[in-house]
Every structure is written in C-alpha cells, then in structure tokens.
C-alpha cells in the first residue's frame, strides 16, 4: 500500500487540528469584537463625562453671573464681563459637541421634569407605569376578543354546525 494514497491522507489528527484552528479563530474574533465593543463603550463614557463637565461649568458660570448681576457694583464689571465671555465660550463648546451626540434621542417630555428640578428617573418611572396601564388595557381587549370569538363559534356551531366544522378544518383546530 502506498502511504500517499487518499486512504492514508485523512487521518483523525487532521480534523482535530482543523477543528482547533477553527475554534481558535472564533475565539480570537470574539475577543477582538469584545475589545472593540469595550473601547467603543469607553469612548462613549468619556464623551458623556466631558459633556457633564461642560454642563456643570455652564451651570456654575450662570449661577455666578446671576449673583454678580443681582448685587451689581461697578467694580465687578470686569468680572461680570469675563464670566459672560466664559459662558458664551461654554455655549460654543456645547454647540460643537452636539454632533457627537447626534445618535442619542432625548424625549422632549423629560424637560418639564428637569425644569421642576425632579429626578429624570421619575420620568422613566412614569413612562413605565403608563406603559403597564396601556398593556393591561390591551390585554383586556385581547381577552374580550377571545371570549367573543369563543362565544361566536359556540353560537355558530349551534346554528350552522357544517360551517363551523369546515372553518375549524381550514384553521387547523
């Protein structure tokens, strides 16, 4: 027998090594995807932290300007002008940053909650409660339609039994 014949070419070791290489490749792809996803999440978190920092700076500048304006004295004019300029630069920075958050959607209904100083999580809670109420109402309607259908089939089976038998055959019931 010739060792180069096809009978000797497919040894059990080849499929095992082939399977290992496929498994290794899959593991490498999964690891690379996980690393890529982690890096993307890290970048998103950094963008959000940067936005939070800018918003806090803006809020602090606005508060300080309010204090200066409410107790205005001419000797504080330069400080007030500097803070107004800083506020304008902060708004420009926020305007430049808006492009990095174009894929984020914020519901406009949350703004009254924020204006009232409420926690945004209350908005989420109220949305969930509304959704649960709507789901209960829809589930109630579904149950009513099921009962109506059962009652209708019962009445039809008494009046037109052949029709109901044919209907059930077509529906596979």
Swiss-Prot record:
**CC per GO annotation:** mediator complex
- Judging by the UniProt lineage, the source's domain of life is Eukaryota
Alphabetical UniProt keywords: Activator, Nucleus, Transcription, Transcription regulation
Q: What is the protein's major site of localization?
A: nucleus
Where does this protein have compositionally biased stretches of type Polar residues? Answer: 1-20
Subcellular location, record wording:
Nucleus
Q: Does the keyword Transcription regulation apply?
A: yes
UniProt GO BP: regulation of transcription by RNA polymerase II
Which segments carry the region annotation Disordered? 1-45
Alphabetically, the GO molecular function entries are: transcription coregulator activity
**Pfam families, alphabetically?**
Med10
Which stretches does UniProt call biased (Basic and acidic residues)? 21-45
Q: InterPro entries annotated for this entry?
A: Mediator_Med10
Its biological purpose is as follows: Component of the Mediator complex, a coactivator involved in the regulated transcription of nearly all RNA polymerase II-dependent genes. Mediator functions as a bridge to convey information from gene-specific regulatory proteins to the basal RNA polymerase II transcription machinery. Mediator is recruited to promoters by direct interactions with regulatory proteins and serves as a scaffold for the assembly of a functional preinitiation complex with RNA polymerase II and the general transcription factors.
Q: How does it assemble?
A: Component of the Mediator complex.
The family line of this record is: Belongs to the Mediator complex subunit 10 family.
What is this protein's record name? Mediator of RNA polymerase II transcription subunit 10
Whichever gene encodes this chain, its name is mdt-10
